[in-house]
Amino acid sequence: MAEVFTNALKRSVGVVTTSSSGSIGANATTITGISTAAVAVGYLVDNGNFIGGAKVSVIGAGQVTVDSTSTNTSSTTTQTVNFVGLTTIYASTGQKSILIGGTLANNTTNQVSATVQVSSGSTSYNLLYKVPVPAGSSVVISDAGKTLLNASDEIRVGSSVAISLDVTLSILQGVA
């Protein structure tokens, strides 16, 4: 199979839902006392009590279950929790590919935080996590290195502010 360069482009990336009344138990996987409207399974949990990349795995009435344990050693209340939806920018077409590089451009007048993940099945890995992108500026992905993508991998991007980023990725498809 011949190698082919392609660009993956998305405009206005960013889906965010915020709840400011969360309760998180010590070393817990559940956040209670929150509104779950507009929250979806797979959304990132943005709160200082969970490691980067923690995701919503189950949604219940007024609570969510997270796929990792909280890091706090005692229960905490009135927590602000952001739920960040990831947008799939690139999905492999059944062949190995290489992420050559990319740019995240901030289209807003305020700084935003960007997250870029490679997802392989149900497992995701952060390429960038909560990287600040100044107002009217951009961040370059893989400036010095390349990232190999397996045949079923996806690249997903999230932002701390809704519809705030334009994303361009350069990808070499069909590598052996």
Language-model segments: residues:
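Small/polar beta-strand repeat architecture
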Residues: 15-85
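C-terminal interaction-tip segments
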Residues: 1-14, 84-107, 159-176
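Short, well-ordered loop/turn sites that connect or cap secondary structure elements
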Residues: 38-40, 133, 149
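Beta-sandwich interaction modules
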Residues: 136-152
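Beta-strand signatures of extracellular beta-sandwich domains
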Residues: 44, 115-117, 168-170
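Noncatalytic modules at the cell exterior or secretory-pathway interfaces
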Residues: 147-163
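Short, surface-exposed beta-strand/strand-loop-strand elements in extracellular ectodomains
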Residues: 109-130
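Short proline/glycine- and polar residue-rich coil/turn motifs
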Residues: 58-60, 131-139
